[in-house]
Amino acid sequence: MKTQHQWWEVLDPFLTQHEALIAFLTFAAVVIVIYLYRPSWSVCNVPGPTAMPLVGHLPLMAKYGPDVFSVLAKQYGPIFRFQMGRQPLIIIAEAELCREVGIKKFKDLPNRSIPSPISASPLHKKGLFFTRDKRWSKMRNTILSLYQPSHLTSLIPTMHSFITSATHNLDSKPRDIVFSNLFLKLTTDIIGQAAFGVDFGLSGKKPIKDVEVTDFINQHVYSTTQLKMDLSGSLSIILGLLIPILQEPFRQVLKRIPGTMDWRVEKTNARLSGQLNEIVSKRAKEAETDSKDFLSLILKARESDPFAKNIFTSDYISAVTYEHLLAGSATTAFTLSSVLYLVSGHLDVEKRLLQEIDGFGNRDLIPTAHDLQHKFPYLDQVIKEAMRFYMVSPLVARETAKEVEIGGYLLPKGTWVWLALGVLAKDPKNFPEPEKFKPERFDPNGEEEKHRHPYAFIPFGIGPRACVGQRFALQEIKLTLLHLYRNYIFRHSLEMEIPLQLDYGIILSFKNGVKLRTIKRF
Protein backbone atom coordinates (compact mmCIF):
# COMPACT_ATOMS: atom_id res chain seq x y z
CA MET A 1 0.00 0.00 0.00
CA LYS A 2 1.42 3.43 -1.05
CA THR A 3 2.29 5.99 1.58
CA GLN A 4 1.07 9.61 1.45
CA HIS A 5 4.51 10.69 0.22
CA GLN A 6 4.41 8.15 -2.61
CA TRP A 7 0.94 9.32 -3.70
CA TRP A 8 2.17 12.93 -3.78
CA GLU A 9 5.09 11.92 -6.00
CA VAL A 10 2.61 10.35 -8.43
CA LEU A 11 0.22 13.34 -8.45
CA ASP A 12 2.82 16.13 -8.41
CA PRO A 13 3.63 16.07 -12.19
CA PHE A 14 -0.09 15.88 -12.97
CA LEU A 15 -0.87 18.86 -10.73
CA THR A 16 1.98 20.82 -12.27
CA GLN A 17 0.64 20.16 -15.77
CA HIS A 18 -2.89 20.92 -14.59
CA GLU A 19 -1.79 24.21 -13.06
CA ALA A 20 0.09 25.10 -16.23
CA LEU A 21 -3.01 24.40 -18.32
CA ILE A 22 -5.13 26.55 -16.01
CA ALA A 23 -2.55 29.33 -16.21
CA PHE A 24 -2.47 29.11 -20.00
CA LEU A 25 -6.26 29.14 -20.31
CA THR A 26 -6.48 32.05 -17.89
CA PHE A 27 -3.86 33.96 -19.84
CA ALA A 28 -5.63 33.19 -23.14
CA ALA A 29 -8.96 34.32 -21.69
CA VAL A 30 -7.41 37.58 -20.51
CA VAL A 31 -5.83 38.18 -23.93
CA ILE A 32 -9.16 37.49 -25.68
CA VAL A 33 -11.05 39.81 -23.32
CA ILE A 34 -8.48 42.56 -23.82
CA TYR A 35 -8.59 42.10 -27.60
CA LEU A 36 -12.38 42.15 -27.74
CA TYR A 37 -12.96 45.03 -25.35
CA ARG A 38 -9.89 47.25 -25.57
CA PRO A 39 -11.24 49.37 -28.48
CA SER A 40 -14.39 50.20 -26.51
CA TRP A 41 -12.45 51.03 -23.34
CA SER A 42 -10.80 53.97 -25.09
CA VAL A 43 -14.20 55.55 -25.80
CA CYS A 44 -16.14 54.26 -22.77
CA ASN A 45 -16.79 57.85 -21.68
CA VAL A 46 -19.08 58.31 -24.69
CA PRO A 47 -22.67 57.30 -23.80
CA GLY A 48 -24.34 54.34 -25.44
CA PRO A 49 -26.34 51.17 -24.76
CA THR A 50 -24.78 48.13 -23.10
CA ALA A 51 -23.04 46.02 -25.72
CA MET A 52 -23.52 42.26 -25.94
CA PRO A 53 -20.33 40.17 -25.89
CA LEU A 54 -18.83 39.60 -29.33
CA VAL A 55 -21.78 40.96 -31.39
CA GLY A 56 -21.93 44.39 -29.76
CA HIS A 57 -25.06 46.23 -30.86
CA LEU A 58 -25.69 44.28 -34.08
CA PRO A 59 -28.89 42.76 -32.60
CA LEU A 60 -30.25 46.31 -32.32
CA MET A 61 -29.54 46.81 -36.02
CA ALA A 62 -31.38 43.58 -36.79
CA LYS A 63 -34.33 44.81 -34.72
CA TYR A 64 -34.62 48.40 -35.97
CA GLY A 65 -32.80 48.34 -39.33
CA PRO A 66 -31.63 51.75 -40.62
CA ASP A 67 -33.76 53.46 -37.94
CA VAL A 68 -31.55 52.13 -35.14
CA PHE A 69 -29.46 55.32 -35.02
CA SER A 70 -32.53 57.55 -34.78
CA VAL A 71 -33.78 55.42 -31.89
CA LEU A 72 -30.44 55.66 -30.07
CA ALA A 73 -30.05 59.40 -30.77
CA LYS A 74 -33.36 60.05 -29.01
CA GLN A 75 -32.13 58.11 -26.00
CA TYR A 76 -28.46 59.13 -25.78
CA GLY A 77 -28.24 62.48 -27.52
CA PRO A 78 -26.34 63.84 -30.54
CA ILE A 79 -23.14 61.86 -29.95
CA PHE A 80 -23.16 58.25 -28.79
CA ARG A 81 -21.30 54.95 -29.03
CA PHE A 82 -22.44 52.03 -31.21
CA GLN A 83 -20.57 48.71 -31.27
CA MET A 84 -20.32 47.02 -34.67
CA GLY A 85 -19.24 43.72 -33.18
CA ARG A 86 -15.88 44.49 -31.56
CA GLN A 87 -15.46 47.84 -33.35
CA PRO A 88 -16.88 50.90 -31.57
CA LEU A 89 -18.34 53.67 -33.72
CA ILE A 90 -18.84 57.18 -32.46
CA ILE A 91 -22.11 58.25 -34.09
CA ILE A 92 -22.62 61.96 -34.76
CA ALA A 93 -26.30 62.85 -35.04
CA GLU A 94 -26.32 66.65 -34.95
CA ALA A 95 -25.79 69.09 -37.83
CA GLU A 96 -23.27 71.40 -36.15
CA LEU A 97 -21.17 68.46 -34.96
CA CYS A 98 -21.21 67.11 -38.52
CA ARG A 99 -19.83 70.42 -39.72
CA GLU A 100 -17.15 70.20 -37.02
CA VAL A 101 -16.08 66.72 -38.15
CA GLY A 102 -16.46 67.17 -41.90
CA ILE A 103 -15.14 70.71 -42.33
CA LYS A 104 -13.72 72.50 -39.29
CA LYS A 105 -11.58 69.56 -38.15
CA PHE A 106 -11.18 67.80 -41.48
CA LYS A 107 -7.38 67.69 -41.09
CA ASP A 108 -7.86 65.67 -37.91
CA LEU A 109 -10.28 63.25 -39.61
CA PRO A 110 -9.22 63.20 -43.28
CA ASN A 111 -9.84 59.54 -44.07
CA ARG A 112 -12.77 57.16 -44.17
CA SER A 113 -12.68 54.21 -41.83
CA ILE A 114 -12.69 50.96 -43.77
CA PRO A 115 -15.37 48.45 -42.69
CA SER A 116 -14.87 44.72 -43.11
CA PRO A 117 -16.80 44.35 -46.42
CA ILE A 118 -14.40 46.83 -48.04
CA SER A 119 -11.18 45.65 -46.39
CA ALA A 120 -11.74 42.25 -48.02
CA SER A 121 -12.06 43.75 -51.51
CA PRO A 122 -9.06 45.53 -53.12
CA LEU A 123 -11.31 46.47 -56.05
CA HIS A 124 -13.43 48.63 -53.76
CA LYS A 125 -10.62 49.60 -51.40
CA LYS A 126 -8.47 51.27 -54.08
CA GLY A 127 -11.15 53.65 -55.37
CA LEU A 128 -11.32 57.33 -54.46
CA PHE A 129 -13.93 56.63 -51.80
CA PHE A 130 -11.62 54.67 -49.47
CA THR A 131 -8.17 55.76 -50.62
CA ARG A 132 -6.30 57.61 -47.88
CA ASP A 133 -4.01 60.56 -47.18
CA LYS A 134 -1.83 62.01 -49.96
CA ARG A 135 -2.87 59.48 -52.59
CA TRP A 136 -6.52 60.41 -52.02
CA SER A 137 -5.73 64.13 -52.24
CA LYS A 138 -3.90 63.78 -55.56
CA MET A 139 -6.53 61.45 -57.01
CA ARG A 140 -9.32 63.80 -55.97
CA ASN A 141 -7.69 66.87 -57.53
CA THR A 142 -7.28 65.07 -60.85
CA ILE A 143 -10.82 63.66 -60.84
CA LEU A 144 -12.39 67.00 -59.87
CA SER A 145 -10.82 68.59 -62.93
CA LEU A 146 -12.79 66.13 -65.09
CA TYR A 147 -16.14 67.30 -63.72
CA GLN A 148 -16.08 70.75 -65.24
CA PRO A 149 -19.52 72.24 -66.05
CA SER A 150 -18.67 72.30 -69.75
CA HIS A 151 -18.03 68.54 -69.74
CA LEU A 152 -21.27 67.83 -67.89
CA THR A 153 -23.16 69.98 -70.38
CA SER A 154 -21.70 67.98 -73.25
CA LEU A 155 -23.14 64.79 -71.73
CA ILE A 156 -26.78 65.96 -71.91
CA PRO A 157 -27.44 64.60 -75.45
CA THR A 158 -25.93 61.24 -74.50
CA MET A 159 -27.97 61.03 -71.31
CA HIS A 160 -31.16 62.04 -73.12
CA SER A 161 -30.60 59.44 -75.82
CA PHE A 162 -30.28 56.62 -73.29
CA ILE A 163 -33.32 57.87 -71.33
CA THR A 164 -35.62 57.96 -74.37
CA SER A 165 -34.38 54.56 -75.50
CA ALA A 166 -34.88 52.98 -72.07
CA THR A 167 -38.47 54.21 -71.74
CA HIS A 168 -39.72 53.42 -75.25
CA ASN A 169 -41.56 50.29 -74.12
CA LEU A 170 -43.67 52.28 -71.65
CA ASP A 171 -45.89 53.42 -74.55
CA SER A 172 -48.01 50.28 -74.47
CA LYS A 173 -51.13 49.80 -72.35
CA PRO A 174 -50.98 50.47 -68.59
CA ARG A 175 -48.93 47.81 -66.85
CA ASP A 176 -46.86 47.21 -63.75
CA ILE A 177 -43.11 47.73 -64.08
CA VAL A 178 -40.31 47.17 -61.56
CA PHE A 179 -38.77 50.61 -61.92
CA SER A 180 -35.89 49.88 -59.55
CA ASN A 181 -34.66 47.33 -62.12
CA LEU A 182 -35.34 49.60 -65.10
CA PHE A 183 -33.49 52.50 -63.49
CA LEU A 184 -30.51 50.33 -62.56
CA LYS A 185 -30.16 49.28 -66.21
CA LEU A 186 -30.58 52.86 -67.42
CA THR A 187 -28.09 54.39 -64.99
CA THR A 188 -25.60 51.59 -65.65
CA ASP A 189 -25.83 52.28 -69.39
CA ILE A 190 -25.34 56.03 -68.89
CA ILE A 191 -22.39 55.71 -66.53
CA GLY A 192 -20.95 52.93 -68.71
CA GLN A 193 -20.83 55.34 -71.63
CA ALA A 194 -19.59 58.25 -69.50
CA ALA A 195 -17.02 56.25 -67.52
CA PHE A 196 -15.85 53.55 -69.94
CA GLY A 197 -17.01 54.77 -73.32
CA VAL A 198 -18.87 51.44 -73.56
CA ASP A 199 -22.53 50.90 -74.44
CA PHE A 200 -23.64 48.01 -72.23
CA GLY A 201 -26.94 47.91 -74.11
CA LEU A 202 -29.01 47.00 -71.05
CA SER A 203 -31.85 49.48 -71.48
CA GLY A 204 -32.11 50.02 -75.23
CA LYS A 205 -34.90 49.02 -77.59
CA LYS A 206 -32.94 45.91 -78.50
CA PRO A 207 -30.66 45.03 -75.57
CA ILE A 208 -27.23 43.86 -76.69
CA LYS A 209 -26.85 40.11 -76.19
CA ASP A 210 -23.12 40.21 -75.61
CA VAL A 211 -22.01 37.41 -73.29
CA GLU A 212 -18.99 39.37 -72.04
CA VAL A 213 -21.08 42.47 -71.31
CA THR A 214 -23.78 40.42 -69.58
CA ASP A 215 -21.17 38.60 -67.54
CA PHE A 216 -19.50 41.86 -66.54
CA ILE A 217 -22.79 43.38 -65.35
CA ASN A 218 -23.76 40.22 -63.47
CA GLN A 219 -20.40 40.26 -61.69
CA HIS A 220 -20.88 43.96 -60.91
CA VAL A 221 -24.34 43.43 -59.41
CA TYR A 222 -23.21 40.42 -57.35
CA SER A 223 -20.12 42.21 -56.05
CA THR A 224 -22.19 45.22 -55.02
CA THR A 225 -24.92 43.24 -53.24
CA GLN A 226 -22.34 41.44 -51.07
CA LEU A 227 -21.24 44.69 -49.37
CA LYS A 228 -23.32 43.94 -46.28
CA MET A 229 -23.07 45.76 -42.96
CA ASP A 230 -24.87 43.10 -40.92
CA LEU A 231 -24.56 39.37 -40.27
CA SER A 232 -25.87 38.32 -43.69
CA GLY A 233 -22.56 38.66 -45.53
CA SER A 234 -19.85 36.07 -46.15
CA LEU A 235 -18.26 34.29 -43.18
CA SER A 236 -15.04 36.31 -43.46
CA ILE A 237 -17.02 39.57 -43.49
CA ILE A 238 -18.99 38.44 -40.42
CA LEU A 239 -15.72 37.61 -38.68
CA GLY A 240 -14.43 41.02 -39.73
CA LEU A 241 -17.35 42.59 -37.89
CA LEU A 242 -16.96 40.40 -34.81
CA ILE A 243 -13.26 39.46 -34.57
CA PRO A 244 -11.30 41.47 -37.20
CA ILE A 245 -8.02 39.66 -36.57
CA LEU A 246 -9.57 36.46 -37.95
CA GLN A 247 -11.03 37.99 -41.11
CA GLU A 248 -8.03 37.77 -43.40
CA PRO A 249 -6.80 34.28 -42.33
CA PHE A 250 -10.30 32.85 -42.75
CA ARG A 251 -10.79 34.66 -46.05
CA GLN A 252 -7.57 33.17 -47.40
CA VAL A 253 -8.82 29.68 -46.50
CA LEU A 254 -12.49 30.08 -47.44
CA LYS A 255 -11.81 31.67 -50.82
CA ARG A 256 -10.15 28.38 -51.82
CA ILE A 257 -13.15 26.24 -50.87
CA PRO A 258 -15.61 25.97 -53.80
CA GLY A 259 -19.19 26.81 -52.95
CA THR A 260 -18.54 29.15 -50.04
CA MET A 261 -19.71 32.74 -50.29
CA ASP A 262 -16.10 33.91 -49.87
CA TRP A 263 -15.11 31.72 -52.83
CA ARG A 264 -17.87 33.24 -54.96
CA VAL A 265 -16.99 36.80 -53.92
CA GLU A 266 -13.29 36.20 -54.59
CA LYS A 267 -14.03 34.67 -57.97
CA THR A 268 -16.38 37.52 -58.86
CA ASN A 269 -13.94 40.24 -57.84
CA ALA A 270 -11.09 38.52 -59.68
CA ARG A 271 -13.13 38.35 -62.88
CA LEU A 272 -14.26 41.95 -62.48
CA SER A 273 -10.68 43.10 -61.95
CA GLY A 274 -9.52 41.14 -64.96
CA GLN A 275 -12.25 42.57 -67.18
CA LEU A 276 -11.57 46.10 -65.96
CA ASN A 277 -7.84 45.69 -66.54
CA GLU A 278 -8.55 44.54 -70.10
CA ILE A 279 -10.72 47.61 -70.73
CA VAL A 280 -8.04 49.92 -69.30
CA SER A 281 -5.25 48.23 -71.27
CA LYS A 282 -7.23 48.33 -74.51
CA ARG A 283 -8.15 51.98 -74.07
CA ALA A 284 -4.55 52.92 -73.23
CA LYS A 285 -3.34 51.30 -76.47
CA GLU A 286 -6.02 52.99 -78.55
CA ALA A 287 -5.14 56.43 -77.16
CA GLU A 288 -8.20 58.07 -78.71
CA THR A 289 -7.55 61.80 -78.51
CA ASP A 290 -11.18 62.77 -79.12
CA SER A 291 -12.80 60.47 -76.55
CA LYS A 292 -14.37 62.27 -73.60
CA ASP A 293 -15.31 59.40 -71.31
CA PHE A 294 -13.95 59.31 -67.76
CA LEU A 295 -11.45 56.51 -68.41
CA SER A 296 -9.94 58.26 -71.44
CA LEU A 297 -9.61 61.52 -69.52
CA ILE A 298 -7.88 59.75 -66.63
CA LEU A 299 -5.44 58.06 -69.02
CA LYS A 300 -4.67 61.38 -70.69
CA ALA A 301 -4.12 63.02 -67.31
CA ARG A 302 -1.75 60.20 -66.37
CA GLU A 303 0.32 60.70 -69.50
CA SER A 304 0.50 64.48 -69.18
CA ASP A 305 1.16 64.72 -65.43
CA PRO A 306 4.15 62.94 -63.79
CA PHE A 307 2.42 62.99 -60.40
CA ALA A 308 -0.75 61.47 -61.86
CA LYS A 309 1.32 58.72 -63.49
CA ASN A 310 2.57 57.59 -60.07
CA ILE A 311 -0.89 57.79 -58.52
CA PHE A 312 -3.01 56.26 -61.29
CA THR A 313 -1.38 52.88 -61.71
CA SER A 314 -3.41 50.31 -63.64
CA ASP A 315 -5.00 48.75 -60.54
CA TYR A 316 -6.05 52.14 -59.16
CA ILE A 317 -7.44 53.24 -62.53
CA SER A 318 -9.51 50.05 -62.68
CA ALA A 319 -10.76 50.62 -59.12
CA VAL A 320 -11.65 54.29 -59.66
CA THR A 321 -13.42 53.57 -62.94
CA TYR A 322 -15.39 50.72 -61.40
CA GLU A 323 -16.22 52.94 -58.43
CA HIS A 324 -17.83 55.37 -60.86
CA LEU A 325 -19.90 52.51 -62.25
CA LEU A 326 -21.11 51.60 -58.76
CA ALA A 327 -21.64 55.15 -57.47
CA GLY A 328 -23.20 56.30 -60.73
CA SER A 329 -25.70 53.47 -61.07
CA ALA A 330 -27.00 52.00 -57.82
CA THR A 331 -27.32 55.29 -55.92
CA THR A 332 -28.94 57.21 -58.79
CA ALA A 333 -31.34 54.34 -59.52
CA PHE A 334 -32.33 54.29 -55.85
CA THR A 335 -33.12 58.02 -55.86
CA LEU A 336 -35.11 57.83 -59.11
CA SER A 337 -37.14 54.92 -57.71
CA SER A 338 -37.75 56.89 -54.51
CA VAL A 339 -39.08 59.92 -56.40
CA LEU A 340 -41.54 57.92 -58.50
CA TYR A 341 -42.74 55.91 -55.51
CA LEU A 342 -43.31 58.96 -53.31
CA VAL A 343 -44.86 61.21 -55.96
CA SER A 344 -47.24 58.45 -57.08
CA GLY A 345 -48.61 58.37 -53.55
CA HIS A 346 -49.10 62.15 -53.30
CA LEU A 347 -51.35 63.41 -56.07
CA ASP A 348 -51.12 67.06 -54.93
CA VAL A 349 -47.35 66.92 -55.42
CA GLU A 350 -47.79 65.22 -58.79
CA LYS A 351 -50.24 67.90 -59.99
CA ARG A 352 -47.90 70.76 -59.12
CA LEU A 353 -44.90 68.95 -60.61
CA LEU A 354 -46.72 68.30 -63.90
CA GLN A 355 -47.74 71.96 -64.13
CA GLU A 356 -44.12 73.07 -63.82
CA ILE A 357 -42.84 70.52 -66.32
CA ASP A 358 -45.61 71.19 -68.86
CA GLY A 359 -44.95 74.92 -68.57
CA PHE A 360 -41.38 74.52 -69.77
CA GLY A 361 -42.32 74.01 -73.41
CA ASN A 362 -42.76 71.40 -76.10
CA ARG A 363 -42.33 67.81 -74.94
CA ASP A 364 -39.52 67.30 -77.47
CA LEU A 365 -37.52 70.29 -76.22
CA ILE A 366 -34.30 69.08 -74.60
CA PRO A 367 -33.39 71.31 -71.63
CA THR A 368 -29.93 72.84 -71.39
CA ALA A 369 -27.76 72.68 -68.30
CA HIS A 370 -28.90 76.23 -67.48
CA ASP A 371 -32.53 75.15 -67.81
CA LEU A 372 -32.01 72.21 -65.49
CA GLN A 373 -30.44 74.43 -62.89
CA HIS A 374 -32.88 77.37 -62.99
CA LYS A 375 -36.19 76.44 -64.68
CA PHE A 376 -37.45 73.65 -62.41
CA PRO A 377 -37.47 74.85 -58.78
CA TYR A 378 -40.29 72.54 -57.68
CA LEU A 379 -38.61 69.53 -59.29
CA ASP A 380 -35.54 70.42 -57.23
CA GLN A 381 -37.66 70.41 -54.09
CA VAL A 382 -39.22 67.05 -54.97
CA ILE A 383 -35.81 65.45 -55.55
CA LYS A 384 -34.40 66.85 -52.30
CA GLU A 385 -37.39 65.68 -50.30
CA ALA A 386 -37.17 62.19 -51.82
CA MET A 387 -33.46 62.06 -50.97
CA ARG A 388 -34.27 63.17 -47.43
CA PHE A 389 -37.05 60.63 -47.08
CA TYR A 390 -34.91 57.75 -48.38
CA MET A 391 -31.28 58.66 -47.69
CA VAL A 392 -29.27 56.32 -49.93
CA SER A 393 -26.12 56.76 -47.81
CA PRO A 394 -27.41 57.27 -44.25
CA LEU A 395 -23.92 57.02 -42.74
CA VAL A 396 -20.67 58.75 -43.67
CA ALA A 397 -17.49 57.24 -42.26
CA ARG A 398 -14.47 59.08 -40.89
CA GLU A 399 -11.45 58.06 -38.80
CA THR A 400 -9.37 60.19 -36.44
CA ALA A 401 -5.78 60.69 -37.60
CA LYS A 402 -4.77 61.88 -34.13
CA GLU A 403 -6.31 62.54 -30.74
CA VAL A 404 -9.13 65.03 -31.21
CA GLU A 405 -12.01 66.47 -29.20
CA ILE A 406 -15.48 66.19 -30.71
CA GLY A 407 -18.59 67.34 -28.88
CA GLY A 408 -16.77 67.51 -25.56
CA TYR A 409 -15.33 63.99 -25.81
CA LEU A 410 -11.63 63.30 -26.33
CA LEU A 411 -11.28 60.61 -28.98
CA PRO A 412 -7.97 58.74 -29.46
CA LYS A 413 -6.21 58.24 -32.79
CA GLY A 414 -7.86 55.57 -34.92
CA THR A 415 -11.39 56.12 -33.60
CA TRP A 416 -14.15 55.49 -36.13
CA VAL A 417 -16.44 58.53 -36.28
CA TRP A 418 -19.56 58.10 -38.41
CA LEU A 419 -21.91 60.92 -39.38
CA ALA A 420 -25.55 59.83 -39.20
CA LEU A 421 -26.96 61.75 -42.18
CA GLY A 422 -30.10 59.63 -42.06
CA VAL A 423 -30.78 60.76 -38.49
CA LEU A 424 -30.30 64.42 -39.43
CA ALA A 425 -32.78 64.00 -42.28
CA LYS A 426 -35.49 62.78 -39.89
CA ASP A 427 -34.78 65.23 -37.04
CA PRO A 428 -38.01 67.18 -36.31
CA LYS A 429 -35.97 70.18 -35.16
CA ASN A 430 -34.90 70.76 -38.75
CA PHE A 431 -37.70 68.91 -40.54
CA PRO A 432 -41.08 69.28 -38.80
CA GLU A 433 -43.29 66.24 -39.36
CA PRO A 434 -40.33 64.29 -40.80
CA GLU A 435 -42.43 61.25 -41.73
CA LYS A 436 -44.49 63.32 -44.18
CA PHE A 437 -43.44 63.81 -47.80
CA LYS A 438 -43.47 67.61 -48.18
CA PRO A 439 -41.30 68.97 -51.03
CA GLU A 440 -42.24 72.56 -50.12
CA ARG A 441 -40.07 72.25 -47.01
CA PHE A 442 -37.15 72.91 -49.40
CA ASP A 443 -38.70 76.08 -50.86
CA PRO A 444 -35.87 78.66 -50.53
CA ASN A 445 -38.46 81.32 -49.69
CA GLY A 446 -40.16 79.21 -47.02
CA GLU A 447 -39.64 79.71 -43.31
CA GLU A 448 -38.62 76.09 -42.74
CA GLU A 449 -35.77 76.33 -45.24
CA LYS A 450 -34.62 79.70 -43.89
CA HIS A 451 -34.43 78.47 -40.29
CA ARG A 452 -32.90 75.07 -41.00
CA HIS A 453 -29.26 74.41 -40.15
CA PRO A 454 -27.25 74.54 -43.42
CA TYR A 455 -25.80 71.07 -42.75
CA ALA A 456 -29.00 69.33 -41.71
CA PHE A 457 -29.40 67.98 -45.25
CA ILE A 458 -26.17 66.69 -46.81
CA PRO A 459 -27.10 63.67 -48.97
CA PHE A 460 -23.83 63.85 -50.94
CA GLY A 461 -21.62 64.06 -47.87
CA ILE A 462 -19.72 66.99 -46.45
CA GLY A 463 -16.43 68.80 -46.88
CA PRO A 464 -13.56 67.75 -49.15
CA ARG A 465 -14.72 64.12 -48.96
CA ALA A 466 -18.16 64.93 -50.41
CA CYS A 467 -19.26 63.11 -53.58
CA VAL A 468 -17.35 64.48 -56.59
CA GLY A 469 -20.07 63.33 -58.99
CA GLN A 470 -23.10 64.98 -57.41
CA ARG A 471 -23.68 67.41 -60.30
CA PHE A 472 -23.49 64.52 -62.77
CA ALA A 473 -26.04 62.56 -60.72
CA LEU A 474 -28.47 65.47 -60.35
CA GLN A 475 -28.29 66.24 -64.06
CA GLU A 476 -29.12 62.61 -64.88
CA ILE A 477 -31.95 62.47 -62.32
CA LYS A 478 -33.57 65.67 -63.59
CA LEU A 479 -33.36 64.67 -67.25
CA THR A 480 -34.91 61.28 -66.50
CA LEU A 481 -37.77 62.66 -64.42
CA LEU A 482 -38.52 65.39 -66.96
CA HIS A 483 -38.81 62.87 -69.76
CA LEU A 484 -40.96 60.49 -67.73
CA TYR A 485 -43.42 63.06 -66.38
CA ARG A 486 -43.78 64.73 -69.75
CA ASN A 487 -45.27 61.48 -71.00
CA TYR A 488 -46.51 59.40 -68.08
CA ILE A 489 -47.93 59.30 -64.59
CA PHE A 490 -47.47 56.45 -62.13
CA ARG A 491 -49.46 54.65 -59.48
CA HIS A 492 -48.55 52.12 -56.82
CA SER A 493 -48.85 48.53 -57.96
CA LEU A 494 -51.23 46.34 -55.99
CA GLU A 495 -48.43 43.77 -55.89
CA MET A 496 -45.98 46.15 -54.18
CA GLU A 497 -45.43 46.16 -50.44
CA ILE A 498 -46.21 49.35 -48.50
CA PRO A 499 -44.12 50.56 -46.79
CA LEU A 500 -41.10 49.53 -48.79
CA GLN A 501 -38.57 47.23 -47.13
CA LEU A 502 -34.90 48.20 -47.24
CA ASP A 503 -31.66 46.23 -47.45
CA TYR A 504 -28.90 47.66 -45.28
CA GLY A 505 -25.43 47.65 -46.84
CA ILE A 506 -22.76 50.17 -47.79
CA ILE A 507 -25.66 51.90 -49.54
CA LEU A 508 -29.38 51.36 -49.06
CA SER A 509 -31.43 49.43 -51.58
CA PHE A 510 -35.07 48.40 -51.88
CA LYS A 511 -35.29 44.79 -50.77
CA ASN A 512 -38.09 43.77 -53.14
CA GLY A 513 -37.90 46.57 -55.68
CA VAL A 514 -40.27 49.43 -56.53
CA LYS A 515 -43.18 48.28 -58.69
CA LEU A 516 -45.47 50.91 -60.25
CA ARG A 517 -48.35 51.07 -62.72
CA THR A 518 -47.46 53.20 -65.78
CA ILE A 519 -50.19 55.34 -67.37
CA LYS A 520 -49.57 57.29 -70.58
CA ARG A 521 -50.64 60.95 -70.32
CA PHE A 522 -51.34 61.71 -73.98
From Swiss-Prot:
Q: What is its main location?
A: membrane
Signal peptide region: none
What cellular component GO annotations does this protein have?
membrane
Q: Could you tell me which PROSITE patterns the record lists for this protein?
A: CYTOCHROME_P450
Specify one Pfam family: p450
- Residue intervals passing through the bilayer: 14-34
Q: Where in the cell is it found?
A: Membrane
Q: Does the keyword Chaperone apply?
A: no
Give the protein name, as stated in the record. Cytochrome P450 711A1
The gene from which this protein is expressed is CYP711A1
